[in-house]
Amino acid sequence: MSAGRPGPNVGGELSLATFNTHLGVDGWGRPYDVVAACRSLDADVLVLQESWAPDGSPSLARRVADDLGYDLVEEPLGQGRLLGPDPGADDRWGPSLGPLSTILHVDDDPRWRQRRSGARRSGGRHGSWGLAVLVRVPARFLGVTRLRPLRRDPVRRLVLSWEVPVGNGVLTVHGTHVSHLLQGSPVHYRELSRALAPGGRPAVLAGDMNLWGPAVSLQLPGWRRVVRGRTWPATRPHSQLDHVLVSGFVTGSGAVLGPLGSDHRPVRAELVVDDAPPGGAAGGTTAPGTTAPGGGGHGTAR
C-alpha cells in the first residue's frame, strides 16, 4: 500500500459503498464530478459499475483511485461510443428512464446499431466501460470470476474479488454488475450461487444486481441483505437494484444515500467482522472460472 493511507482495520470494522456511475454523465450526456461523488462516500472499499474509459485516457475509476488514494482493479465489460451532451437538454436529469442507448452506442450489438441511424445527435468518443473495485486499506487481490456470455446481453459480466484483513479476521470482498432479468440474469445468479457459496466464511458481495431485494435473496441463499432502500431511478426511486450482501460472521448497517449525478443512488454500509472459530477465516482459494492474480493480466492493481 502507498504511504499515508489508512492501516489495517484493527477494530474489526470496514466501510464499503457501491455506486453505478452511469458512465459519469446524466441522461442527456452531461458530465458530473465522479471523483467528488466518490469522495463524499468516504468508504474503505468502493465498488464502481459503468466506469467509462475513453480510448487512450484513464477510466473514471482510475481517476478516483489516483485522486483519492485507492488501489484499484478494473475490468472492461463492453465497448462503444459515448455521445456528447444533447443540445436540447433541459433541467431534468434526462429525457427518459430508458436504456443507455440514448447516450451510448454499443459495439457488436445489432439492436443498438439499428438505433444509431435514428439518433438525435452524433459524434462523441469511443471507449470502454466496466467494473472496478477500489480499496484504501491493506488488501490482496484474489482474482476475476468470469460469467458465461448471455445471448441477449452484449456486455460481459464478472466478479472482482479481494481479501481484506479486518480486526482479527479476513473478509472476502466481491464486486459485480449483474445482467438484467430480461437478458437472462437467472443463469448468472446460478453461477454466482455456486462460485461464491458462503461456506461460513466472512464475505461481502456488492454491486448493481439489476434485481429487487427479495428476488436477490432467493437467488443467492446464504447471503443476507445489509441495506434496504430504493436506489433506482435516483430522482424518484421506486426499486432497489443496488445491494450489499454479507455471509458468515459479518454484521452491518448502512443506508441508501442521496443522488450524486447517476441514475442510481449509492449504497453505503459499515461492516463488522466478528471473531470466527479457528479455520473460519476466508482463504485464498479461487472458485471455478476464476483468474488468479497474474494469471491473465486483465486486472490492474497498483
Give a label for each model feature.
Residues M1-V45, A53-G56, D67, D71-R302:
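Active-site regions of metal-assisted phosphoester/phosphodiester hydrolases
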Residues E50:
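Second-shell loop/turn segments in exported
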Residues R62:
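Active-site phosphate/pyrophosphate- and oxyanion-stabilizing loops and adjacent acidic/basic residues
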